[in-house]
Amino acid sequence: MWCRRLACLLSVPCQHTRHRLLGPSCGRRTFTAAVARWHHTAPESLSCAWQLHGDHLELRYADTLMRFDFVWLRDHCRSASCYNAKTNQRSLDTASVDLSIKPKAVRVDETTLFLTWPDGHVTRYGLQWLVKNSYEGQKQQVMHPRILWNAEIYRQAQVPSVDCQSFLETDEGLKEFLQNFLLYGIAFVENVTPTKEDTQILAERISLIRETIYGRMWYFTSDFSRGDTAYTKLALDRHTDTTYFQEPCGIQVFHCLKHEGTGGRTLLVDGFYAAEQVLRQAPDQFELLSKVPLKHEYIENVGDCHNHMIGVGPVLNVYPWNNELYLIRYNNYDRAVINTVPYDVVNRWYTAHRTLTTELRRPENELWVKLKPGKALFIDNWRVLHGREAFTGYRQLCGCYLTRDDVLNTARLLGLQA
């Protein structure tokens, strides 16, 4: 999923540029040759090798070729004087580190890198820690493991709902729910008492509620009490919410408390699955959608509600080091005037947007569900688009937004990668 793998990691030749090598290797020899060369932890072993350059250390370990700037190596020292292991915070003043610093001696054994600095301070790094935290290592990892889906994939997965009592009272139930949510971007809780108060208790099990211009917990009917198409009986096309916030709300909770009529099914589309298809078909268009910033806007003047919100960002948001998609900002209702895009890019942007929209609207990518009293739906608003078919009669939903950081925090505390 949008991870660029390093190719031919072990095919990099030794560089014969002139740098003075300092200090002993593995405690056996002192290298003073003027030509950079690889040094190994043992004569017969190629499991770990390193060489010094003018401003960085090059290390080959666990099939990964890594480069570490000397300032980085000094700044990230985990010694007691540089790092507080109790608070997991840096103690070293980074601004005090000489930007031209070089180690006085370097030694590597089977598990550890040792660096001695000009002032005599010794830094130790576990080789596995370096692999995990190197730029090269991070390029090969995903921040958030996911299963991308269309309707058929999701149905075949038979992802179970979690019982409300298990969700509220056991870590096992909560962990199962969060695992489903992290992998698929949606998750259901069943047997919830159909009241706003009980839905709030459910939501607060995993996160603080994010208060917005809509309040904390809200009732959702077709009375047009707010200046938004959602407060009608009309169909809603697929979209993500609060694109007009600088940081869109991370998670949305829906619970249908009552519906006396027909229609009103909820539409769910995995935006990341659609974006993956764009990446495969037209990578240049994917890149354009990830780089061109757009404004989204919400202007409201209904009753006592007066708001003017503006959020700016590209449709697709990716981590730059591994090209992993982490947020889709897609809402054609709230997209503002396009005035942040140069004339000669506008048509290419519309073409890319059309390609993405085509994927989002493919019938095979649409998962339709009927929300009923007692079944709460949690949606990753940074990933899964939602919509609604038109309906008749009285329909009442309640729900809220959750702070994404708190949901992910809960997941990590339960041992999940999030």
Swiss-Prot record:
It comes from Gallus gallus (Chicken). This is Trimethyllysine dioxygenase, mitochondrial. The lineage of its organism: Eukaryota, Metazoa, Chordata, Craniata, Vertebrata. GO terms for cellular component: mitochondrial matrix; mitochondrion. Homodimer. Keywords: Carnitine biosynthesis, Dioxygenase, Iron, Metal-binding, Mitochondrion, Oxidoreductase, Transit peptide. The keyword Mitochondrion applies. Converts trimethyllysine (TML) into hydroxytrimethyllysine (HTML). It catalyses: N(6),N(6),N(6)-trimethyl-L-lysine + 2-oxoglutarate + O2 = (3S)-3-hydroxy-N(6),N(6),N(6)-trimethyl-L-lysine + succinate + CO2. GO terms for biological process: carnitine biosynthetic process. InterPro entries: AlphaKG_dependent_hydroxylases, GBBH-like_N, GBBH-like_N_sf, TauD-like_sf, TauD/TfdA-like, Trimethyllysine_dOase. The gene is TMLHE. It comes from the Eukaryota. Transmembrane segments: none annotated.
